[in-house]
Amino acid sequence: MSTEFPTKNGINREWHVIDAENVVLGKLASRAAMILMGKHKPTYTPFIDAGDHVVVINAEKVKVTGRKEEDKLYRHFTGYPGGLVEKSLKRVRAEKPTRIVEDAIAGMLPKNKLGKQMYRKLNVYAGSKHPHAAQQPVALTVK
């Protein structure tokens, strides 16, 4: 008797919506990453993308603890000499609030092709409205 692995056709993908208002960023990101990877399912297999879709709303109202608002830095390199750009979490929240949640969740996913596939099932919105009502997402609470 051999182990049966789920196939692409045999995977039932659901949609989940998480309200990020007053939720700690790390707890939100770990819960969303777990759902994107499919670790909440009994058929979880590390080398198969069996995860569900996740919609995060109110990303601009996510909470961070301690002094991270001023101390946490987001860096990217432009490709030019001296082109390392550093922005504080406070500034990133003002310019593009969805990036805070997207980066936190992406950091908890695998760094390979499978991780990119999982990341594509993530949808983050700054406000409380999202265009995925037709998929009938199930509301999730993060403690």
Swiss-Prot record:
It comes from Solibacter usitatus (strain Ellin6076). Belongs to the universal ribosomal protein uL13 family. The gene is rplM. The keyword Ribosomal protein applies. This is Large ribosomal subunit protein uL13. Keywords: Ribonucleoprotein, Ribosomal protein. Part of the 50S ribosomal subunit. HAMAP family: Ribosomal_uL13 (MF_01366). Pfam families: Ribosomal_L13 (PF00572). InterPro entries: Ribosomal_uL13, Ribosomal_uL13_bac-type, Ribosomal_uL13_sf.
